[in-house]
From Swiss-Prot:
It comes from Gluconacetobacter diazotrophicus (strain ATCC 49037 / DSM 5601 / CCUG 37298 / CIP 103539 / LMG 7603 / PAl5). Residues 24-293 form the CoA carboxyltransferase N-terminal domain. Binds 1 zinc ion per subunit. This is Acetyl-coenzyme A carboxylase carboxyl transferase subunit beta. Gene3D superfamilies: 2-enoyl-CoA Hydratase, Chain A, domain 1. GO terms for biological process: fatty acid biosynthetic process; malonyl-CoA biosynthetic process.
Length: 300
């Protein structure tokens, strides 16, 4: 008996443990159902049980959005690393180093150019995994670089937003990126080029108050949180209870703040159609590009 308990059973347990890797399954953030990781990846990180759209990495966004094998990421301008010599629980320079090591990204925005539905396009993707996608000087430079590249290539600019707002470690330098990115959007308009924004969960703060809400066409993924201040802050300020679903994509669609809510698997085709229409018609207004169509909801 001791031979069985001390030798055979531990060996069996060890074999069983090795057969089931820790990263084989994951749980949905919304419904808590278990999902096979490879099935979740095939579904573009959309829960097959409840349809919840989980966060996506920069690499995944580029891979899903561009036609296969057509995109190239660009090197972005360098900026001063720590203009204020800021320190909270740790030095800002140390925080950046840790975030870069953890996320394998240089900053909270990446830019690439390629083809979407056969059309040339420039795409900028915000990385929420990098200090909550906060906006600092590097993001401002990245956005300007994306706009300039779009103008150079005479191509539309598509931006995927995901942000907690301005980066407090950069103070006023961070807030200055709001007018800078707004100027970049105006540069695109002056050049007659389409600017399409895809709002993802969450898009808040200074990003919402600047380039995230200036698109010629405003698209959102289902149930994305979109707003400036948080719901509790607003309720404390106005002394009123806010409506159910306030600041969610569907509420904003009903109240005319965005043009359409599109499920993630349908996004590449929708972007290709929009770019084709807007390039062909040489228009900036979403109503003209869509023939005056009504707001679009995701298919059931």
């Amino acid at each position: 008996m001791s031979w069985l308990t001390e030798y055979v059973r531990p060996k069996i347990r060890g074999l069983l443990k090795r057969e089931v890797p820790d990263n084989l399954w994951t749980n949905c953030e919304s419904c808590s159902q278990m999902i096979l990781v490879k099935d979740l990846q095939k579904a573009m990180n959309v829960c097959p049980h409840c349809g919840h759209h989980m966060r996506a990495s920069v690499a995944e966004r580029f891979g899903w959005t561009f036609d296969e094998g057509t995109f190239t990421r660009i090197e972005l301008p360098k900026v001063p690393v720590d203009p204020l010599s800021f320190r909270d629980r740790k030095r800002y320079t140390e925080r950046l180093k840790d975030e870069r090591s953890k996320s394998q990204l240089d900053e909270s925005m990446a830019v690439a150019h390629g083809r979407i539905g056969g059309h040339d396009a420039v795409v900028a993707v915000m990385a929420f995994e990098f200090i909550a996608g906060t906006m600092g000087a590097a993001l401002g430079e990245a956005f300007l670089a994306a706009a300039r590249l779009a103008i150079l290539q005479k191509a539309p600019l598509v931006v995927f937003t995901a942000s907690g707002g301005a980066r407090m470690q950069e103070g006023m330098v961070s807030l200055m990126q709001m007018p800078r990115t707004t100027v970049a959007v105006q540069m695109l308009r002056d050049a007659g080029l389409p600017y399409i924004v895809v709002l993802t969960n969450p898009t808040t703060g200074g990003v919402t108050a600047s380039f995230a809400m200036l698109g010629d066409v405003q698209i959102s993924e289902p149930n994305a949180l979109i707003g400036f201040a948080g719901q509790r802050v607003i309720e404390d300020t106005v002394r009123e209870k806010l409506p159910e679903g306030f600041q969610r994509a569907e509420y904003l669609l009903d109240h005319g703040m965005i043009d359409m809510v599109v499920k993630r698997p349908a996004l590449p085709e929708m972007l290709g159609r929009l770019i084709g229409l807007m390039n062909h018609r040489h228009v900036n207004a979403p109503g003209a590009a869509l023939g005056g169509a009504a707001p679009v909801r995701p298919a059931a």
